[in-house]
A protein has these predicted regions:
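Short loop/turn motifs at secondary-structure junctions and domain boundaries
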Residues: 235-236, 361-366, 422-423
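Bacterial N-terminal signal peptides
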Residues: 7-16
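Noncatalytic scaffold domains of N-terminal-nucleophile
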Residues: 21-53, 57, 65-259, 319, ...
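Active-site rim segments in enzyme catalytic domains, especially the processed small/beta chain
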Residues: 78-95, 99-103, 225-228, 369, ...
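Internal maturation/activation junctions in enzymes
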Residues: 175, 213, 225, 273-386, ...
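Extended C-terminal subregions enriched in glycine
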Residues: 377, 421, 454, 463-524
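Extended C-terminal regions of large enzymes
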Residues: 254-257, 262, 432-449
Length: 556
């Protein structure tokens, strides 16, 4: 097996557990990892540096993009544990080059059978943002196992070795317990040493229908949780067709309507009516048009998007060019909208007669991380792992997420909580194709700001010709003119947040149009993008993650 010099550095670092025992590693321990990288054999861009190394090493050892993504995701549950947990979720978009198909792995858990609207309405008045009651069925593990089974080449044991090396440093109290749990899962896989796929199924059975499921049931039952063994035992990871829309000769893929991703596609439909390149990057007209288009698409998201297995989502109409043509005239280029204006896709009307439901308070959340991977065979993965604010389930070491807070308790609303229902989540990876081949993969952390940032980074590349590094570091903007996706925070009508790097004249122009201007409050950045751009002519894979948001990249 041949290794690049960079790969050997990483392997030497990671194969010395004694030197790292008990030591919290920092970026200085990975001198070859930066926020941007380029190569022709493989590329990874994600959150924690050590997780990026895990993915890069999987590629160097001969694994494909799916193998590398899964290794990265498992490691992120430790390196980025304040944003993503082992009991969390991860929607994944995969381009399988051999089969020439894009598929969605819905790594999203459902509401437990005990999680009813009546329960939360009577006992809580809302779905809590924190604690064990808000835990959905843990879905990340089966999502990753399904990815390895369908597209991968490595075993579960191979995928989690970097994760175990991190856990064995015992930086946090629960690390030792989770390491034991993972090694028990490996022992289950070893019962099928010669059949990789059967071994993966044995791991899934051990977690969802075996000892771990029973331990999670016992702990949740004793500690006020709603999750039970039957919820885990009946969990299924769905493999679905993605949603998509064409845009100026490109095709953009997103997850289904259980996800906020399709609103980015709606926004693109609206923006096709504007010559953004001629209008100029981040010029007042461009920022205004993009913001107003997002407001319209977000209004539809808040009214119609939900689990299609439970409600009839008018997806085809929402993404149609006819509907976009009806809605586009609502954009007044001289004036910021201060009203939420959902449309009527079923009746093909520009504005819905019934006013939208307003929020009732709560807190915003940005507990998410990122992962994009591409390999030399043409496979590409975009994944958005998330899940935190939960609690560690006893000696399992597994932190449960709080994804139920993305549902509501409004009777009759499409996203109202029901047992077995998937929350309408913000986690929204994306792929972009040109002439039938992938040219861009993107993942963004940042709650409701994810697709606002994804839109800008994508258009920075597609319309304005930027490099990945330029695209993720260019000044950004965002609006909170929408219902919050976490505990339904009220909209901030007319709001527009601008990076301070925007020209003074741009601030003044947009304020004159009625936008309520502010600057970012959180460490100077809006959301946290990671992107890979694939040069179809040279085969170069160029990765970049926003350095302000501590994203990391590696390639070889």
């Amino acid at each position: 097996m041949r290794y690049s010099s960079l790969g050997l550095i990483a392997l030497i670092l990671l194969c010395a557990p004694v030197a790292g025992q008990g030591k919290r590693l920092t970026k200085k321990d990975f001198p070859d990892i930066s926020w941007q990288a380029a190569g022709k054999n493989g590329a990874v861009c994600a959150g924690g540096a050590e997780a990026v190394v895990a993915g890069r090493d999987a590629l160097v050892k001969g694994g494909n993009a799916i193998d590398a993504a899964v290794a990265t995701i498992f490691a992120l549950s430790i390196t980025d544990s304040e944003r993503f947990c082992f009991g969390g979720e991860v929607p994944i978009l995969v381009y399988d080059a051999k089969r020439d198909v894009v598929e969605t792995i819905c790594g999203l858990g459902t509401a437990p059978k005990l999680a009813t609207r009546e329960y939360f309405e009577k006992r809580k008045g809302s779905i809590p943002a924190k604690g064990v009651e808000s835990a959905a069925v843990p879905a990340m593990v089966d999502g990753c196992l399904s990815a390895l089974d369908r597209y991968g080449t490595i075993t579960f044991a191979d995928a989690v070795q970097p994760t175990l090396r991190i856990l064995d440093r015992h930086e946090k109290k629960w690390h030792a317990d989770l390491a034991v749990t993972i090694r028990r899962m490996i022992d289950a896989e070893k019962q099928s040493p010669s059949d990789r796929k059967r071994g993966l199924r044995l791991v899934a059975d051990f977690f969802y229908r075996g000892p771990i499921a029973r331990e999670l049931d016992a702990w949740c039952s004793a500690n006020g949780g709603l999750l039970r063994y039957t919820d885990l035992a009946t969990h299924v990871t769905r493999i679905e067709e993605p949603t998509s829309a064409d845009y100026r000769g490109y095709v953009v893929y997103k997850c289904g309507f259980w996800n906020q991703g399709p609103y980015l596609l709606q926004t693109l439909r609206l923006l096709e009516g504007f010559d953004l390149k001629k209008m100029g990057h981040n010029r007042p007209d461009t920022v205004h048009a993009m913001t107003e288009a997002m407001k319209l698409a977000l209004a539809d998201r808040d009214v119609y998007y939900a689990d299609p297995l439970f409600v009839d989502v008018p997806g085809g109409a929402l993404l149609s060019k006819q509907y976009a043509d009806l809605r586009r005239p609502l954009i007044d280029m001289k004036k910021s909208s201060h009203a939420r204006q959902p449309g009527d896709p079923r009746g093909m009307k520009a504005i819905l007669d019934k006013p939208p439901v307003e929020g009732k308070g709560g807190d915003d959340s940005q507990d998410t991380t990122t992962c994009v991977v591409a390999d030399k065979w043409g496979n590409v993965v975009a994944a958005t792992p998330s899940g935190f604010n939960g609690v560690v389930a006893g000696k399992t070491g597994i932190t449960l997420g709080t994804r139920l807070q993305s549902l509501n308790i409004w009777k009759g609303h499409p996203n109202c909580i029901e047992p077995g229902k998937r929350p309408r989540i913000t986690l929204t990876p994306g792929l972009v194709f040109k002439d039938g081949k992938p040219v861009l993969a993107i993942s963004v952390a940042g709650g409701d700001l994810q697709d606002q940032t994804a839109l800008q980074v994508m258009l920075n590349v597609l319309d304005f010709g930027m490099s990945p590094a330029e695209a993720v570091t260019a000044p950004r903007f965002a609006t909170k003119h929408h219902l919050g996706s976490f505990r339904q925070t009220p909209p901030e009508l007319g709001s527009l947040v601008l990076y301070p790097e925007f020209a003074k004249a741009t601030f003044e122009d947009l304020a004159a149009r009625g936008h309520k201007i502010s600057v970012p409050a959180k460490k100077g950045h809006l959301a946290e993008p990671s992107v890979i751009v694939i040069d179809r002519k040279t085969g170069e894979l160029r990765a970049a993650g926003d350095p302000r948001a501590k994203r990391h990249a590696a390639a070889y």
